[in-house]
């Protein structure tokens, strides 16, 4: 993961921890349990919305390194040659398919972001970022989000790309203290998908008209 993109003011650094980092930063050895929780985004991992979006775009394109740019208008064209991040794309395909299933199968955590139009299938994954350590009392009380003090509520996350067969868009959503990613962030993503589809159709019609006029 890139530490910074340097395209926004006050952008924070990201962190994907490893054994060397922990030894240098904390003076302690890495333990197996940290490998397990790191795999699901817990532990010492730190990330920003732009980093999540960039990660999602690189999953969508099959694992090629890309750099975000702010485009002022539709006339700006970039023809960068992207560098592969990985030698094999098999694992990328597994992640792509899993994100598609999460969004388009009824039992998927991202199903609330699914569009009904079969022409536009997106692939996404929800996330819930824990804010406060869960105590034994918390487990016994089993409080709902609205019963928890606002500043202690989890952050709701969602990332996605699409359309699935020919990806053009990637997005990331973080709702601070929003609660569950599937309950809060995924429905918001659906509204964004609708806006993307509308814009996509408008642009497609514009391009077709432009070519007809030539």
Where are these regions (language model features)?
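Glycine-rich loops and low-complexity Gly/Arg-rich segments
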Residues: 64-65, 183-186, 195-200
């Amino acid at each position: 993961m890139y530490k910074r993109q340097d395209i926004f003011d006050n952008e924070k650094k990201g962190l994907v921890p490893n054994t060397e980092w922990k030894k240098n930063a904390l003076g302690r050895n890495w333990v197996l349990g940290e490998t397990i929780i790191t795999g699901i985004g817990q532990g010492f991992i730190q990330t920003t919305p732009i980093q999540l979006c960039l990660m999602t775009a690189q999953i969508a394109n099959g694992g090629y390194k890309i750099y975000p740019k702010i485009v002022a208008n539709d006339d700006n064209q970039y023809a960068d040659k992207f560098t592969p991040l990985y030698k094999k794309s098999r694992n990328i395909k597994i992640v792509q398919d899993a994100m598609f299933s999460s969004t388009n199968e009824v039992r998927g955590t991202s199903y609330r972001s699914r569009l009904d139009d079969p022409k536009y299938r997106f692939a996404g994954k929800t996330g819930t970022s824990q804010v406060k350590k869960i105590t034994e009392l918390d487990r016994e009380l089993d409080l709902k989000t609205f019963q928890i003090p606002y500043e202690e509520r989890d952050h709701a996350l969602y990332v996605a790309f699409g359309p699935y067969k020919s990806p053009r868009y990637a997005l990331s959503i973080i709702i601070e203290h929003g609660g569950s990613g599937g309950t809060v962030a995924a429905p918001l993503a659906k509204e964004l998908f609708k806006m993307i589809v509308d814009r996509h159709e408008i642009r497609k019609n514009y391009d077709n008209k432009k070519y007809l006029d030539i």
